[in-house]
Amino acid sequence: MKILVVQESDWIKRNPHQQHHLMERLTLRGHQVKVIDYPIDWKEEKGRYNRRNVVDGYYKIHPESRVQVISPTILKIPYFSYPSMLFYHRREVKRQIKEFEPDVIIGFGIINTYLASRTAKKEKIPFIYYWIDVLHMLIPENGFQALGEYLERATIKNSTQVIAINYKLEDFVKALGAKNTKVIGAGIDLGKFDPNIKSSNIRQEYGINNEDTVLFFMGHLYNFAGLKEIALELAKGHNPNLKLLIVGDGDAYQELQDIIKENNLSSKVILTGLKSYNEIPELVAASDICILPAYPDEKIMQDIVPIKIYEYMAMCKPVITTKLPGIMMEFGDDNGICYVDKPSDVIFKSYEIDIIAEGRKARKFVEKNDWSKITNEFEKTLQDLQK
């Protein structure tokens, strides 16, 4: 099967998401996959435009997989980037339909996904709108968010099927008008995220002793991530053997560094910066409890369930999270997830939980989410659209 994917983030630079796992695994099964992507961090690069670029045989997770990544030309000028995207991505979609002749098109974005859905409908090509996030809420220019939602609704109307990564997100897309919906949950590589991975080297590298209890966070360090509140709570003189290990970069990184310096927390709060995906399992193994302390009223956190939660659970790690609706709906109670009202409460909850017992519950809950099973379900969905 020939599969064309369109998305509005950088396929190569960003950490693996649902689409990376699925598409690479599909190529291992003999399917051909081409991806049209967009350098969302273009403001950090020099120059006024990027020329069209094609990377053949790219993989992020599986060395044997082969995905072609196409980055159309864009103008890197504020307020002109979106119009240029409309022009060049529309042209690229039409080019791929003519040259590649895809059997199905799958969209993970807003603008280029809308363009692809229109063209797919016109050319009578099955189109899947795959939701792993509420994307219009992530648009940095607030004035464009309403337009983003309008395009999402229009794309839903053009879609053959709408897939959501969790049930809360399925409710959200139904409210936007989606009818033919399906939930295909996040997958886990149960071999890679093995609870028996040794972590002594990581603990030694970061000065973590055997008697220390480590809280672990990984991901983009948004200001609403709740990490600053936890660091400040640690500064109040809690258990000296409680440490916070943070993997990632982002908006709150500098402020976290300042908090660490001003409160002499260098031995209690560890910032590793960005790490490769292959390093993550050993880092998770070095922790005792994983956390997602995002502000519970943050809009973009209401309907999502990050894949990393499943990966933590696969490694027998209990997870402490604020009461986020998507996560509460997905996991419920007594499945290795512990809920708190606000970020600073994570510290107090960590004293209460039975780490081993909750970790076992977590592992048991996610064992059904092995990537091979998720890929089977997704592949069957694609094949059914061909009938």
Residue ranges, per PLM feature:
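Nucleotide-sugar-dependent
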Residues: 13-17, 225, 278-282, 290-311, ...
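Membrane-proximal helix-turn-helix segments that form the acceptor-binding/catalytic region
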Residues: 22, 91-95, 114, 118-122, ...
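Conserved donor-binding/catalytic core segment of Leloir-type glycosyltransferases
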Residues: 163, 209-234, 245
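Carbohydrate-associated surface elements
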Residues: 168, 187
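A short helix/loop element that forms part of the nucleotide-sugar donor recognition site in Leloir-type
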Residues: 194-208
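Nucleotide-activated donor-binding/catalytic signature segment of Leloir-type glycosyltransferases, i.e.
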Residues: 247, 255-281
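Conserved acidic donor-binding segment of nucleotide-sugar-dependent glycosyltransferases
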Residues: 331-344, 350-354
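A charged, aromatic-enriched C-terminal amphipathic alpha-helix characteristic of glycosyltransferases
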Residues: 356-384
